[in-house]
């Protein structure tokens, strides 16, 4: 218990971060603006006009009003709505600008902590580990040999004040936290968290993602403590992001509950063959243990949510499944581990015998129904998968239309290159090709057949993916061995964000 408390009571001398003055610096908004341009470039290219909302004049006007009203504390109080001109003029635009600037500022101490932690531990930064595809080789090597999998939908805080309380353990600048509460109170109605919170998160994505990730980090740090049965909560992969200041005081009740059960119950949770994976709000816990062990983990997760995060666990949040007859819906793939039987014939002197051997094989396929639903939502086809024309693109030139369709097709092919079965991917390519042809035919007021006959079938050569061209150079198609390599799954280490159409969650 003393070791546990010693870790939780971290050194406070390194936690003096005064971030509030940075909110008045122009370069902060310029950095947030550049980040927003890079992050909001969708493959559908339908978010033009983002740059028109931000200008140096608007930033200067915003900072002037913040200086003007900060002495009267009107930026932190909304009691007198008649005098608070800051809130009344350009309310949504100013809130979005300040929230994005605040998100850049509050990430500074975390970046400094992470860099210092990596330097002290001698860890070399590997950009390949940032790739989304890097998780699948791990699943193929580890989880395919396991028996049970625990699928967990991490509950989201009903009240956004829980997110502020979590951030309070990391940032000791009271003014910055008051500013954050001001935004959450003014632009999110506390009485209707679902509707207002959704609107707030869409307008202020970077700040919302930061708050949610800090919430997940708090949740996972306690889970690591239970997993390792130790007071040492630090993780090599997460670095100092798992360190907090006021952790012990907040979970005093939770500690009392767990300490009483450590000597008996946690012994039942000891399982060296256990792996944990998380993406977005879903986590997976795989084990070679028994169903009783998985039920014990379910019990501890429910108590963790209720005692520490004040969240009531809803039915169906945690599901226990056997891996060999269940598929994991993760990162736009349906992943499963199936037995691949093989027969080996052996001969010893005059006696021959057959050995039946079954090997677990990790299988990944593209879920065709959700992907068609995403295409239908983007107006490339109907709900049945029949291609339709993209009417909003008919004003573009022919080369721009082909370039946009080709870019979407290449991105999907690049992201789903790890699929074990290519039929679903070929169907998606067919839908996009025919949708492109229908769009061009609609623009020229012609039929698809007449349009392709007039211009030739080579018009849609843009749809040949870059991966195929690379494979032609690296894997010659002459030998049968190279053909087997060509059909294998390929995981790329340069994918740092999930494809717009592949994100069905």
From Swiss-Prot:
It is found in: Plastid, Chloroplast. InterPro entries: Domain_X, Maturase_MatK, Maturase_MatK_N. It holds the Pfam family MatK_N. The keyword Plastid applies. Signal peptide: none annotated. GO terms for cellular component: chloroplast. One of its GO terms (biological process) is tRNA processing. Its main location: plastid. The keyword Methyltransferase does not apply. GO terms for molecular function: RNA binding. Keywords: Chloroplast, mRNA processing, Plastid, RNA-binding, tRNA processing. Belongs to the intron maturase 2 family. MatK subfamily. Usually encoded in the trnK tRNA gene intron. Probably assists in splicing its own and other chloroplast group II introns. HAMAP family: MatK (MF_01390). This is Maturase K. It comes from Hedera helix.
């Amino acid at each position: 218990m003393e070791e546990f408390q010693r870790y939780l009571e971290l050194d406070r001398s390194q936690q003096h971060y005064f971030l509030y003055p940075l909110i008045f610096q122009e370069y902060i908004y310029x950095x947030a603006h550049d980040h927003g341009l890079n992050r909001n470039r969708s493959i559908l290219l339908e978010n033009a006009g983002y740059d028109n909302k931000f200008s140096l004049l608007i930033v200067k006007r915003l900072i002037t009003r913040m200086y003007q009203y900060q002495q009267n504390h009107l930026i932190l109080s909304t009691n007198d709505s008649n005098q608070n001109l800051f809130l009344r003029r350009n309310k949504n635009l100013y809130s979005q600008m300040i929230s994005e600037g605040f998100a850049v500022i509050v990430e500074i101490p975390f970046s400094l902590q992470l860099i210092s932690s990596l330097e002290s531990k001698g860890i070399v930064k590997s950009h390949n580990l940032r790739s989304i595809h890097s998780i699948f080789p791990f699943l193929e090597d580890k989880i395919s040999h396991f028996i049970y999998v625990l699928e967990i939908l991490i509950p989201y805080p009903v009240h956004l004040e829980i997110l502020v309380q979590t951030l309070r353990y990391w940032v000791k600048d009271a003014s910055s936290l008051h500013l954050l509460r001001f935004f959450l109170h003014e632009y999110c109605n506390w009485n209707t968290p679902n509707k207002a919170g959704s609107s707030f998160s869409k307008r202020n994505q970077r700040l919302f993602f930061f708050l949610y990730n800090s919430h997940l980090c708090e949740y996972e740090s306690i889970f690591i403590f239970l997993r390792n049965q130790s007071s040492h909560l630090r993780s090599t992969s997460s670095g100092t992001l798992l360190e907090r200041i006021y952790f012990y005081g907040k979970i005093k009740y939770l500690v009392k509950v767990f300490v009483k059960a450590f000597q008996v119950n946690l012994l039942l949770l000891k399982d060296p063959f256990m792996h944990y994976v998380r993406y977005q709000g879903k986590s997976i816990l795989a084990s070679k243990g028994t169903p009783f062990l998985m039920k014990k983990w379910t019990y501890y997760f429910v108590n963790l949510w209720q005692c520490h995060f004040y969240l009531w666990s809803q039915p169906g949040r945690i599901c226990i499944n056997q891996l060999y007859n269940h598929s994991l819906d993760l990162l736009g793939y349906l992943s499963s581990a199936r037995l691949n039987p093989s027969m080996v014939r052996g001969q010893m002197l005059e006696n021959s015998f057959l050995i039946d051997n079954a090997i677990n094989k990790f299988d990944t396929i593209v879920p065709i129904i959700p992907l068609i639903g995403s295409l239908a939502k983007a107006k490339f086809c109907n709900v049945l998968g029949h291609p339709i024309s993209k009417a909003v693109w008919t004003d573009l030139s022919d080369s721009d239309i082909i370039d946009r369709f080709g870019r979407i097709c290449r991105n999907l092919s690049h992201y789903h290159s790890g699929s074990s079965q290519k039929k679903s991917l070929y169907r998606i390519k067919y839908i996009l090709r025919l949708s492109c042809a229908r769009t061009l035919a609609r623009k020229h007021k012609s039929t698809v057949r007449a349009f392709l006959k007039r211009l030739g079938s080579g018009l849609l050569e843009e749809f040949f993916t870059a991966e195929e061209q690379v494979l032609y150079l690296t894997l010659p198609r002459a030998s049968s061995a190279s053909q087997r390599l060509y059909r294998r799954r390929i995981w790329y280490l340069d994918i740092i964000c999930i494809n717009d159409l592949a994100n069905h969650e």
